[in-house]
Amino acid sequence: MTETIDPDLIERGRKTFAGDWHFIWASPSIETLPPMDGLEVAFAGRSNVGKSSLINALTGRNALARTSHTPGRTQELIFFDGPPGAGLRLVDMPGYGYAAASKAKVASWTSLIHKFLQGRATLARVYVLIDGRHGLKDVDLDILKTLDKAAVSYQIVLTKADQVKAAELAERVDATRTALAKHPAAFPELLTTSSRTGAGMPELRAAMIRLLDERR
């Protein structure tokens, strides 16, 4: 499911994410964003798609990003820095598509996300997490259109791959690739992951190292 990646990138990704990753900032509004520093990659997705679990699995720190069984709990942009010299920062974005949230709250989150996407020069890529059990939903497609409009590079990451039969996952990957052909800002490579088993994490880490190389 996941593309073959240069072993050197895999190893460099392993070393980078084996270092000390830590929380540095929480921004409830665009006015409270931290100073731009290094390269930023953000994680977006529907509420309870597994963003926090994926960040924890990436960094090997079970409690780095707070996980919650309450959809829509993350209402801020959460920033994490890596070890000295990593040059990489992770951003956990508010979950979207939570039907029980008030209209005012949804409007506030939407405004924050849009402003962040359009005005952050250090933002290199957004990883859009899609639940591998369900595939793309209308609300996901809306976010992809927003990213296209903002001209922000993004890449699809299918989560919870361990909870889907192989044949179903293959169908989900094919359907997602077909849908992405209509989106100009989408990075063509699709990743499949499992935070529980660690599947796909080496490839995702390597993808970020490749981004760092491209920006240097």
UniProtKB/Swiss-Prot annotation:
A Pfam entry, by short name: MMR_HSR1
Spans traversing the lipid bilayer: none
SUPFAM superfamilies in alphabetical order: P-loop containing nucleoside triphosphate hydrolases
A GO-annotated cellular component: cytosol
Family statement drawn from the similarity comment of this UniProt entry: Belongs to the TRAFAC class TrmE-Era-EngA-EngB-Septin-like GTPase superfamily. EngB GTPase family.
Gene: engB
GO biological process: division septum assembly
Record-annotated EngB-type G domain positions: 37-214
Function noted in UniProt: Necessary for normal cell division and for the maintenance of normal septation.
Keyword presence, GTP-binding: yes
Entry cofactors: Mg(2+)
InterPro entries for this protein: G_ENGB_dom, GTP-bd, GTP-bd_ribosome_bio_YsxC, P-loop_NTPase
Originating species: Rhodopseudomonas palustris (strain HaA2)
Name assigned to this protein: Probable GTP-binding protein EngB
Keywords noted in UniProt: Cell cycle, Cell division, GTP-binding, Magnesium, Metal-binding, Nucleotide-binding, Septation
GO molecular function: GTP binding; metal ion binding
Binding-site residues for GTP, renumbered to this chain: 45-52, 72-76, 92-95, 159-162, 193-195
Ligand binding (Mg(2+)): S52, T74
